[in-house]
UniProtKB/Swiss-Prot annotation:
Belongs to the short-chain dehydrogenases/reductases (SDR) family. NAD(+) binds at residues 46-70. Its EC number is 1.-.-.-. NCBIfam families: PRK06701.1. The keyword Oxidoreductase applies. Substrate binds at residue 178. The active site is at 191 (proton acceptor). Residues 1-26 are annotated as: Disordered. InterPro entries: NAD(P)-bd_dom_sf, Sc_DH/Rdtase_CS, SDR_fam. This is General stress protein 39. Keywords: Oxidoreductase, Stress response. The gene is ydaD. Pfam families: adh_short_C2. The lineage of its organism: Bacteria, Bacillati, Bacillota, Bacilli, Bacillales.
Length: 286
């Protein structure tokens, strides 16, 4: 078993979604002994938030399985270039697309650019997100509410709506949700609401697209060490992050790749409308 850190040094970042290169320790995004088995060979995957965190881990794992990758990210260019470099070392293509996933026009352009430059689209991973803790609903402005929903939920709606113009039977859509809509979080009210919307969207789109042979599933991470954490919380909160899980530590991005590879591959051909929980041992109900 890998020896992942149970405690994190106190640290914080001033802007979201955060910079992976500034984190200490660096998130673990790759199993060095992971050997791909061509599970995604010849396929094209578009991954939002693919520059860092869980998105980086998924990008690298998909590359090892033979997929060409389009990474959609906001403006963390250094992280994106580092991920692209690692992806291309696997002998596949990697396209970087920077912009605001909360805008429908950009989402349409991202899908079209992926199809044009990589030759198609087989896998959509809706992974981008942001969060802004507040002590009370009274502290959540309309601007924050709209911004959080645009990034977390509207982006998934826009990208899915456009992607189905190109997705063929056997294709997969994977949405990143969270443990929060299952257990609640009184300081992340708007964020948790977006994740609840994603859960409903996943199930509904699974029903809507099953006739087209397109599977739609989700992954619900627990407390995971990604750039969003130091970019969200004060340093004293970061120092305790993840220690309240049964495993007593935060998860690492790499610990999700098995789920995302499974849901993208033919190994999950009889799964749709489902959510896989990666949360360090917390039991939740659906």
């Amino acid at each position: 078993m890998a020896n992942y850190p149970k405690e994190l040094p106190a640290q914080t970042q001033s802007r979201q979604p955060g910079i992976e290169s500034e984190m200490n320790p660096s998130p673990v995004y790759e199993y060095e002994d992971y050997k791909g088995a061509d599970k995604l060979k010849g396929k094209v995957a578009l991954i939002t938030g693919g520059d860092s965190g869980i998105g980086r881990a998924v990008s690298v794992a998909y590359a090892k399985e033979g997929a060409d990758i389009a990474i959609v990210y906001k403006d963390e260019h250094e992280d994106a270039e580092e991920t692209k470099k690692r992806v291309e070392q696997e002998g596949v293509k990697c396209l970087l697309i920077a912009g605001d996933v909360g805008e429908e026009e950009f989402c349409n352009e991202a899908v079209e650019k992926t199809v044009k430059e990589l030759g198609g689209l087989d896998i959509l991973v809706n992974n981008a997100g942001e969060q802004h803790p507040k002590e009370s609903i009274k502290d959540i402005t309309s601007e924050q509410l709209h911004r959080t929903f645009k990034t977390n939920f509207y982006s998934q709606f826009y990208l899915t709506k456009k992607a189905i113009d190109y997705l063929k039977p056997g294709s997969a859509i994977i949405n990143t949700t969270s443990i929060n809509p299952y257990v609640g979080n009184p300081t992340l009210i708007d964020y948790t609401a977006t994740k609840g919307a994603i859960n409903a969207f996943t199930r509904t789109m699974a029903q809507a697209l099953v006739k087209d042979g397109i599977r739609v599933n989700a992954v619900a991470p627990g407390p995971i060490w990604t750039p969003l954490i130091p970019a969200t919380f004060p340093e004293e909160t970061v120092a305790q992050f993840g220690q309240d899980t049964p495993m007593g530590r935060p998860g690492q991005p790499v610990e999700h790749v098995g789920c995302y590879v499974l849901l993208a591959s033919d190994e999950s051909s009889y799964m749709t409308g489902q959510t896989l929980h990666v949360n360090g041992g917390n039991f939740v109900t659906t």
